[in-house]
């Protein structure tokens, strides 16, 4: 399987929430595959939540099947959305990971630069 994302914005302001749409592309014998997702906040500070506002906990995993809004209509390409809200004025870097019950893991790093809304003179 592979993990990818829809277009991501490059900058985020403090307090701003951005959408991260993920694609889980499956191939081979995936009929009995079960997945879990987690993330690690490498740089900056912020919160990751699902489409119902439930926060994911940094460095903990959650079953992907329990993700609200998980689109399983196409069994080969599952789609789900998470939201990131920056709570600091620093650059944010997050590493998302999905692993299956066969021991395989895929990672994707997401980076947002800070957006300076006021220019100091």
What are these regions (language model features)?
Residues 1-121:
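First exposed extracellular module after export/assembly in secreted or surface-exposed proteins
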């Amino acid at each position: 399987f592979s993990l990818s994302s829809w277009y991501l914005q490059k900058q985020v302001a403090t307090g701003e929430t951005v959408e991260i749409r993920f694609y889980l592309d499956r191939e081979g014998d995936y009929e009995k595959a079960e997945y879990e997702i987690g993330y690690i906040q490498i740089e900056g500070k912020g919160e990751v939540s699902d489409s119902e506002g439930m926060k994911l906990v940094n460095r903990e995993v959650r079953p992907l099947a329990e993700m609200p809004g998980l689109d399983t209509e196409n069994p080969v390409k599952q789609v789900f959305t998470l939201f990131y809200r920056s709570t600091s004025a620093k650059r944010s870097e997050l590493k998302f990971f999905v692993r299956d019950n066969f021991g395989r893991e895929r990672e994707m790093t997401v980076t947002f630069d800070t957006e300076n809304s006021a220019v100091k003179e």
